[in-house]
Swiss-Prot record:
Protein name: Large ribosomal subunit protein bL35
InterPro entries: Ribosomal_bL35, Ribosomal_bL35-like, Ribosomal_bL35_CS, Ribosomal_bL35_sf
Source taxon at top rank: Bacteria
PROSITE patterns cross-referenced by the UniProt entry: RIBOSOMAL_L35 (PS00936)
A GO term, aspect molecular function: structural constituent of ribosome
Region span, Disordered: 1-21
Listed GO CC annotations: cytosolic large ribosomal subunit
Alphabetized UniProt keyword annotations: Ribonucleoprotein, Ribosomal protein
Pfam family, one: Ribosomal_L35p
GO biological process: translation
Organism annotation: Vesicomyosocius okutanii subsp. Calyptogena okutanii (strain HA)
Similarity field: Belongs to the bacterial ribosomal protein bL35 family.
């Protein structure tokens, strides 16, 4: 059986947690930041977690994580 390929785009975006979940970065924090409130930008800094329904898809893209 051949080795499975890791999806490199997913590898750069998702990190596996110790409990088996995946974390990623929030979106909407790259540009057009002047109209966004400080509290909104601060909350976007914290890591986001992947929804439970999306975990099988992420696992398929990251077979060795």
């Amino acid at each position: 059986m051949p080795k499975l390929k890791t999806n490199k785009g997913a590898a750069k975006r998702f990190k596996k947690t110790a409990s088996g979940g995946y974390k990623c970065k929030h979106s909407h924090l790259r540009h057009i930041l002047t109209k966004k409130s400080t509290s909104r930008k601060r909350s976007l800094r914290a890591p986001d977690s992947i929804e439970k329904v999306d975990i099988p898809m992420v696992r398929k893209m990251l077979p060795y994580s």
